[in-house]
C-alpha cells in the first residue's frame, strides 16, 4: 500500500505472456542409470593404455554428468519446465624428459581435456577413450623430441574445430568483455593492462 502512494503513472510491462512448454535434452542412454563399474572400467582401461607408453609419467581420465531441472511459473499463467542433461569425458597424458626437464601434455578429445555436451551416455561411448588413449600418450612423448615451430612473422596454420573454437573464444570473446575494454579486468593471471 505504501508504494502505491508514490506511483506517478501506470507502468506498461508488455503483453501478457502465457507460454506453456516442456523441454528435455534428447538422450538415448541416461548417464545416471549406467553402472558405476562400467564408467570406472572405461576410465581404467584408458588409464592402462596410456601408462603402457614409455615416458608417460602422469595420466588423467574423467567423466562428468549433470542433470538440471528447472521450472518457471509466473503469475500470468506461464509454465515452462526443462530438464537438461550434460555428459562429458576426457583423458590426458603427461610425458617428461628428466634430462632436459621438459614436460609435454596431450589430451583428448579437446585441448583442455574434457568435452561436455547436452547428450546422454551415448556421447561417452562415441568418444572411444580407450581406443584413443595410446595415441594420446605417444603424442605426448613425441612432443618431447619434436622440433620447435619456426618463428616467422606470418605463416599458415591449420586448426581443427575444437582448437579453432578456443582461438576464437580467446581472440574475440575475451577482448569484447567490457572489463577488458575498460582495462579493469583482473584475474589470477594478472590484469589486462
Regions found by a protein language model. Give the residues of each.
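Active-site bordering "gate/hinge" segments
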Residues: 1-193
